[in-house]
From Swiss-Prot:
One of its GO terms (biological process) is translation. CDD domains: uS7_Bacteria. Pfam families: Ribosomal_S7 (PF00177). GO terms for cellular component: small ribosomal subunit. Keywords: Ribonucleoprotein, Ribosomal protein, RNA-binding, rRNA-binding, tRNA-binding. This is Small ribosomal subunit protein uS7. It comes from the Bacteria. Part of the 30S ribosomal subunit. Contacts proteins S9 and S11. It comes from Macrococcus caseolyticus (strain JCSC5402) (Macrococcoides caseolyticum). One of the primary rRNA binding proteins, it binds directly to 16S rRNA where it nucleates assembly of the head domain of the 30S subunit. Is located at the subunit interface close to the decoding center, probably blocks exit of the E-site tRNA. Gene3D superfamilies: Ribosomal protein S7 domain.
Length: 156
């Protein structure tokens, strides 16, 4: 925690091709070692594959996929009287998009296809169809929150 008060939240600039801040955030999640050009190339090639395979606009499919991945509820550990409870809490809008993008990239990296472009494209298509690793992660998160609904009164 900085001594001079809270740190100002920096806003991302929209990407040059789709003019979308969400796409810029995804590029930042894909980027490794500051190689933005490589990350952009991967994403735009993946979008081309998505458009080719789905026959729809890649941005529409991507937004649908992200909406299917973003969690509404999650659990947070809360210590009460010597024992830890998994307390279900609602996820703030900013964190929802962050988690959605993070899960999309992480589960893309775990896939078996040869190139990252193919992995990302297939994960986006799967997420748009409510299947795939990232959507399963969201379902598991919601299941955990549902299972621990009894501890909801410990919310803070």
């Amino acid at each position: 925690m900085p001594r001079k008060g809270p740190v100002a939240k920096r806003d991302v600039l929209p990407d040059p091709i789709h003019n979308s801040k969400l796409v810029t955030k995804l590029i930042n999640k894909i980027m490794i070692d500051g190689k933005r050009g490589t990350a952009q190339k991967i994403l735009y090639n993946a979008f081309d594959l998505v458009q080719e395979r789905s026959g729809r606009d890649a941005m529409e499919v991507f937004e649908e996929a992200i909406n299917n991945i973003m969690p509404v509820l999650e659990v947070k550990a809360r210590r009460v009287g010597g024992s830890n409870y998994q307390v279900p809490v609602e996820v703030r809008a900013e964190r929802r998009t962050t988690l959605g993008l993070r899960w999309l990239v992480n589960y893309s990296r775990l896939r078996g296809e040869k190139t990252m472009e193919e992995r990302l494209a297939n994960e986006i298509l799967d997420a748009a169809n409510n299947t795939g690793g990232a959507v399963k992660k969201r379902e598991d998160t919601h299941k955990m929150a549902e299972a621990n609904k009894a501890f909801a009164h410990y919310r803070w």
